[in-house]
């Protein structure tokens, strides 16, 4: 009989009758299979964020389930892309570099792009004429974001060691990434479970680092400016009230 528990605290989960949902985080190979069958767009259930990039790599380059190092590199590429403009400075410690030429550096921040090669190495960039920054610092911070142990980042298809990664600045807003090491995947999946126990809603945005209060104000101004640009583009009026 299964006795599932919360992965961090070890606390037992409620009785099955109280569970509202349970979703296993799947990997990249089902996405690659869908592409192999001719899909132009793949609609999937819960999967790890990096799987959408790794699945495309597996399909394009023909990587196998035991190409551990390549799978780790593809996972890293997906991890670098998965949070969008965090990689281009959206939550960078040295945030003042992003607004060196004005707040438009954040308001018009560009999303990251990865040009991948068959050996697993890739170059991170962003569209021209967009704000933000692609540097060793921005890419390195995203590499370490939410991975736990950098020598054992576990996803369904591979266990990744990012301590061997090499990151080199190739030019303005172009960073070359290579050298991730992979090991065989575990025999378990992470599962997200929800259960009914009342309701609570809220949004918390954490900003940290040097001059965090000033950083927070700049980001608030940028969020409102970006939202107002969207409203104007849709021929809608301004906010009647804002409270931050």
Labelled PLM ranges:
Residues 150-152, 167-243:
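C-terminal catalytic subdomain
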Residues 1-44:
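An acidic, phosphate/nucleotide-engaging active-site surface
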Residues 33, 40-60, 75, 79-80:
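FAD-binding core of FAD-dependent oxidoreductases
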